[in-house]
């Protein structure tokens, strides 16, 4: 469960909309949510937070390092809490479902490729676009 101290630690004032949105992201079954997804979930929970507020708060959370924004091809921005460790993503081209995965071999090979070419890996983002086999 997220705490108000996380907002303060990120340099943000504790407000009811920020708390509600952070709690929604933390408790949601779906880890990657668009601003519209967050808004709909808040409405379904009976929370009175406007869509413009959701967009503004998510942007503030991103700037503060509380969430990570992903702009997967063919879709709008989705957000996930920044508390999870490194992982990569698969995005289903038919449904838009986002699946997280971590593969030590892929991570190792990426570092080798970079090193072989005389570079140091600073960061990376691997997204595989997939479709269920029929």
Curated annotation (Swiss-Prot):
Residues 1-83 are annotated as: DNA-binding. Its main location: cytoplasm. InterPro entries: FUR (IPR002481), Fur_C (IPR043135), WH-like_DNA-bd_sf (IPR036388), WH_DNA-bd_sf (IPR036390). GO terms for cellular component: cytosol; protein-DNA complex. Keywords: Cytoplasm, DNA-binding, Iron, Metal-binding, Repressor, Transcription, Transcription regulation, Zinc. Zn(2+) binds at residues 32, 80, 89, 100. Residues 84-134 are annotated as: Dimerization. GO terms for molecular function: DNA-binding transcription factor activity; DNA-binding transcription repressor activity; ferrous iron binding; transcription cis-regulatory region binding; zinc ion binding. It is found in: Cytoplasm. Fe cation binds at residues 86, 88, 107, 124. Signal peptide: none annotated. Fur acts as a repressor, employing Fe(2+) as a cofactor to bind the operator of the iron transport operon. Involved in exotoxin A regulation, siderophore regulation and manganese susceptibility. NCBIfam families: PRK09462.1 (NF006999). Homodimer. Belongs to the Fur family. This is Ferric uptake regulation protein.
